[in-house]
Amino acid sequence: MTQIVALPGGRAASYEVIGSGRPALMFAGGPGFTASYMNGDAELLSEVLCSYLIDPHGSGSSTPPADPAHYSPEGHARFYEEVRQALALPEVVVLGHSFGGTTALTYAALFPQSTAECVAVAAFGIGPDADAQDEGDAEAEFEALLARHAGSPWYEAARPVMDSWTERLLAATDAAEMEQMMAMVLPFYLAEPDKPEAAARLAEMSRVMKANLAAGKAWEGGLYQGVDLRPLLGRIACPTLIVAGELDFICGPAQAQPIARSIPGSQLAMLPGCGHIPSIEAPEQYRQAVAGFLSR
């Protein structure tokens, strides 16, 4: 059930609560997608976490930021800290997926007093001016993993959308267009999207994902160019787990490995045969990795 919490300045945030364990904040990807697509993550971890799935500002019933620049990872992290304070939650676990994983890392660096543990799933944080080797590895990984789907029936329609994502999104006039675009490219996010069980889970994820076009436009309009977490990663003091799929075309080993190297004492769980959404592709493997880390 969706709930609303009041924030300073007449603003509000919408959220759901799933589970009965330690308090945790779950951060969705995008930026701009509602947190409901992470209900599966929360249910998998319901025995160890009481998860607060918070809609990002501007999504669901959460108030948009006054400045579109606040759709950055730091802007999201500061919004989530306001929500934590408004909910009177103590020190929390933060768990984020994709852009939400990048936000979770940012949150842990900026708010160490609020963060018990950090779990970043399929996160990115190595910017476009990264070490040439890391950048080259990421570009090669991206192209190779897209091309491996070339024989799938959806590929010919989806590949042009992926290749012109920024231009199409900036030209979109409503959130429904962004959601339709996302539905077309979502199969790329799985290592084996044509398996019936994976396809069914992906279809359900697409059904519940609601987009905030303003966040998408701000991101594709240039915010992403400033994302490089390396100056922050060394400041993360809490126990941290980096989870990545070895076949993730966006945030695979070329992102996960340098991120993990940059965080003192962090752990890296590289899930074989997985793409960008391990909670859908290998739910039990994902649950064991995260629950094992949190229960250590």
Task: List the predicted regions and their residue ranges.
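Conserved HGGG/HGGXW glycine-rich cap/lid loop of the alpha/beta-hydrolase fold
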Residues: 7-64, 69, 250
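Active-site loop/oxyanion-hole signature of alpha/beta-hydrolase fold enzymes
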Residues: 56-99, 110, 288
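Conserved hydrolase catalytic core segment
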Residues: 90-137
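Flexible "cap/lid" loop of the alpha/beta hydrolase fold
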Residues: 118-168
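Alpha/beta-hydrolase
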Residues: 155-231, 238
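Short beta-strand/loop motif that positions the catalytic acidic residue
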Residues: 236, 242-244
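Conserved alpha/beta-hydrolase "acid-adjacent" motif
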Residues: 249-255
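Catalytic active-site module of serine/aspartate enzymes centered on a nucleophile-bearing elbow/loop
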Residues: 265-296
